A protein has these predicted regions:
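Structural motif
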Residues: 5, 80-81
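Active-site-proximal region of nucleotide-activated glycan assembly enzymes
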Residues: 102-151
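Conserved nucleotide-sugar phosphate-binding/catalytic loop shared by glycosyltransferases and other
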Residues: 10-12, 28-66, 136, 147
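An amphipathic, basic-hydrophobic alpha-helix
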Residues: 58-80, 99
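An aromatic- and histidine-rich active-site surface loop
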Residues: 81-100
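A short, glycine/small-residue-rich beta-strand->loop->alpha-helix junction that serves as a flexible
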Residues: 8-20
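Histidine-anchored nucleotide/phosphate-binding helix
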Residues: 17-24, 92-95
């Protein structure tokens, strides 16, 4: 049986920390990271296959750069699954991945107990599996799955 290739995409900081806490779920697969070239991302790159993209940060030029960087990585790596814990850094990878026929798994951040994140709201319509960690979010994500505290 062929292993899935997994793209793990997240912003740096807490989003990346949450992704790393999921390692038991992806460690036996072929995987790589897409994140920001900040201190934690650079540290990750010492031991893991890691690509860096521009942070869109509500800047149209940086977002366009992020789109091209994300597309280049997706075409090179050809993942079968994209898993994201947010935030804006992951948006282009998720949408481009969906257009390329990849499965999208989005995990809403644990720090969002009452209201959905902007990225969560944007990725929800295209996610094959959308996991939220607080029951209060069920009304925002009716097709999502309650995962409880998974980190």
């Amino acid at each position: 049986m062929k292993k899935d290739k997994i793209c793990l995409v997240s912003s740096s900081g807490g989003h990346l920390k949450e992704m790393l806490q999921l390692k038991r779920f992806y460690s036996k697969q072929d995987y790589y990271f897409v994140t920001l070239a900040r201190m934690d991302g650079k540290s990750l790159a010492k031991n893991e296959k890691t690509y860096f993209v521009k942070c869109p940060a509500r800047n149209p030029i940086k977002f366009i750069i992020n789109i091209f960087q994300s597309l280049k990585i997706l075409l090179k790596e050809k993942p079968t699954i994209i898993i994201s814990t947010g935030a804006d850094t992951a948006l282009a990878t998720c949408y481009l991945g969906k257009l390329l026929g990849k499965k999208i798994i989005y995990i809403e951040s644990f720090c969002r107990p009452t209201k959905p994140s902007i990225t969560g709201k944007m990725v929800y319509p295209i996610a094959d599996l959308f996991i939220y960690q607080w029951k209060e979010l069920a009304k925002y994500y009716p097709k999502g799955k309650f995962g409880g505290s998974i980190f």
